[in-house]
Amino acid sequence: MNAPAVLPEAQPLSHEGSTRTGVLVLHGFTGNPSSMRGVAEAMVGLGHHVEMPRLPGHGTTVEEMVTTGWADWTGEVRSAHGRLKARVDEIVVVGLSMGGSLTLWSGFELPDVAGLVCINPATTPQAPEVLDMIQEMVDDGTEIAPAIGGDIADPEVQESSYDGAPLRPLLSFMREGLTPMADRYGELALPLLLITSRQDHVVEPANSEHLAATYGGEVEHVWLERSYHVATQDYDRADIERLTGEFVARVTAN
């Protein structure tokens, strides 16, 4: 059986730059690289090497995502990091939503990371009773629930994401991804740029507040007043691209 085709807007990006800095750009749960393309292209414009992978199960069909989980996504992040590391001295990791969670994972697990940029990251799992409810739905045969994507204030912009949320991967994200990290952020000392939308209907801003309050290193916390969850495609997208570029310059030799 042939694998489903990748959506045109979901293609990954790999760019060889002129500096010795790499930027690893990560999208979120049920989304695809299109949500982060503006950030990636801004980093290309600054001359940096860029890798923006398409996470397994994303950018094709929601049915393909059902069989993927945290280990698949971290594996792809590790591979993209390796491709970057082969041609740069240091790397800044930038992620939106679950991509922000993977950014934090990168800070724990990957070498030669100079700084982290988290945009509306998920940092703590849902309450145990919520996870138990999701598990019961899966046990009863429900694989896909209504979508959680598309939270953009700008009416002219539509996010490319699935119209359903696969529940097994969601449980994997919460249990294998967030639960082990949630009380460890104090161990991270890398510079962190944390960008948070005050109005976010997907990931509660309390996730960012928890990260800022418990983080072990320097935190620059910027609040967005005009954008919703997918802020990288929303009213504040140009500010996010500018702030990210300035942060990369500040924490690296470039």
Go through the PLM ranges and name each one.
Residues 166-184:
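Active-site nucleophile elbow and catalytic-triad environment of alpha/beta-hydrolase enzymes
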Residues 117-127:
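Active-site nucleophile loop of the alpha/beta-hydrolase fold
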Residues 4-61:
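Short, surface-exposed "cap/lid" segments of acyl-processing enzymes
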